[in-house]
Amino acid sequence: MRLVFMGTPEFARACLEKLHSDGFDIAAVYTKIDTPKNRGMKLIPSPVKEYAQSVGLSVYQPQSFRDEETVQQLRELKPDLLVVVAYGKILPQAVLDIPKYGAINMHGSILPQLRGSAPVQRSILNHCDEAGVTAMYLSAGMDEGDIIEIRKTAIQPLETSEELMARLAQLAAPLCADTVRSIEAGTAPRIPQDNARATYAPMLSKEESPIDWNQPARFIVDHVRGLVPWPVATAELGGTEFKIYRVEYADQKTEKAPGSVVALTKKGLLVACQEGNTVLVRELQAKGGKRMPAPDYFRGHPITIE
């Protein structure tokens, strides 16, 4: 079976690497254009492009599929199946109609829950106990295609979105290869989604970053976990604005108002939240500084405990 792979981040790279190592015929790889990063604004290739070039696969980086020339270029590759994993571009019906067996996608949620662009992050932000990867057929609707298989995993109590994404990539890679095999063998099921049960996972924004200390401890912990690595939770502590990377539950009670600094311990900064509870800020970053353990920062920048 002749494949064309479409993907961009590390999550997609894991799937491409598995397909290539398992010996599938990959005619070409499509990925988003190189993006400028850091102060020098140097163009950085996607993880998928880096891997594809390292093993000699042809790489295409179209701006979109709106023009006929780009669609015709794909048509000339004569793919039997498109494998799409976190590509980051909308594929029109004219593209989905090209392969004999259509297009499949590895989506980072237990569909029909959390359709959309940020399913892994929203699974933590929504306080879910379980996450997963769904192998599905692509359709014109957003993540509405028929399901082929779902593989699930428990979300760990203090796991960040970044850490969960890495674990889900290890679920997605073998699922991707197994799905291609089942389609090739003619044994892949088509299970329609129950649209009545659908929930959505919209793109994250920086406006979501500020921590609301009036929330319960679990909401604050999940808020911080869900926003790593981007856009990262923010808070003002002792008059300084910080990015907050890791927060844990604390047993200590307090009469201080939510958002007040309660104490600095060897493990981190205790901050008051709802109903007299506290959370422990373990890792943070001041503006212009480095990400570091909270005790290390406050050793050099003493904080006043009122």
Annotate each language-model stretch with its function.
Residues P36-K78:
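N-terminal glycine-/serine-/threonine-rich beta1-alpha1-beta2 phosphate-ribose binding loop
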Residues D25, G56-S58, G102:
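Conserved beta-strand segments of alpha/beta enzyme cores
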Residues N214-E306:
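An anion-binding loop in the catalytic cleft
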Residues T8-F11, Q63-R66, Y87-K89, L227, ...:
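Short beta->alpha connector loops
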Residues A27, I104, G145-I148, Y245, ...:
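A short, local hydrophobic-aromatic micro-motif
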